[in-house]
């Protein structure tokens, strides 16, 4: 695979890789690429809510919905139609509060969490909904809110200079056995690829390798649909 990836890069293809065993460190160094290892001190971070108004589309809402569901339900969790619609409504209303009503100061996971834990109970009451584990939602998502053990993961902006790199390897071996962080960080990286694809016009390739295990679930399959849609448009 090293030789295939190197050949693509030599043919002016931007390469984004997700590695779980330091398999591509040597190649990355050879081509002068950017090698980013996930560590507890320096996690791979991204603020997926920080978007422009024109970027708010069905694909982005779907991505954010899957992100929230992943934290709430886990990769093997079962999401009901009611829960799916509920989170989608909250996401849309959250952005309306920012772009239209100007009642939210900044876009981040922190402000989304603050908005959602107030708005979700209201929607449940307004529509007489039942069977929604609101306590679990509040508790599990709080881990990514300020003060939580993963507070920076979804609140700190990605280094935008990465979009200029032609060869990037994200090494996430240290979290490969974490049932939440592994698929979550893989999602973040895949969204980096989507952003890169929209910004740069040359050919690009996303190589997931062993990290495919992180997205091998029915819930994550929905995100693959999200990923493929703009890829088809770009091609």
Describe the predicted segments one by one.
Residues 1-5:
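Glycine-rich phosphate-binding P-loop
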Residues 6-16, 31-34:
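Post-Walker A helix-loop "phosphate-sensing" segment adjacent to the P-loop in P-loop NTPases
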Residues 19:
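Conserved functional hotspot residues or short segments at active or partner-binding sites
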Residues 22-34, 40, 47-233:
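P-loop NTPase motor domains
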């Amino acid at each position: 695979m090293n030789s295939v990836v190197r050949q693509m890069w030599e043919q002016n293809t931007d390469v984004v890789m997700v590695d779980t065993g330091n398999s591509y460190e040597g190649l990355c160094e050879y081509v002068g690429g950017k090698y980013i290892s996930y560590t507890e001190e320096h996690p791979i971070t991204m603020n997926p809510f920080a978007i422009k108004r024109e970027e708010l589309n069905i694909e982005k809402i779907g991505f954010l919905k899957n992100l929230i569901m992943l934290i709430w339900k886990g990769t093997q969790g079962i999401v009901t139609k009611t829960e799916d619609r509920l989170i989608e409504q909250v996401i849309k209303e959250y952005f309306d509060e920012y772009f239209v009503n100007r009642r939210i100061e900044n876009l981040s996971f922190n402000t989304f969490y603050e908005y959602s834990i107030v708005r979700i109970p209201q929607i449940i009451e307004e529509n007489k909904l039942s069977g929604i584990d609101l306590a679990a939602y509040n508790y599990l998502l709080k881990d990514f809110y300020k003060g939580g053990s993963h507070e920076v993961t979804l609140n700190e902006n990605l280094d935008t200079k990465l979009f200029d790199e032609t060869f990037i390897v994200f090494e996430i071996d240290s979290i490969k056995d974490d049932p939440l962080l592994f698929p979550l960080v893989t999602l973040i990286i895949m969204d980096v690829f989507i952003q890169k694809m929209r910004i740069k016009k040359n050919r690009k390739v996303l190589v997931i390798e062993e990290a495919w295990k992180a997205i091998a679930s029915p819930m994550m399959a929905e995100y693959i649909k999200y990923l493929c849609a703009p890829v088809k448009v770009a091609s």
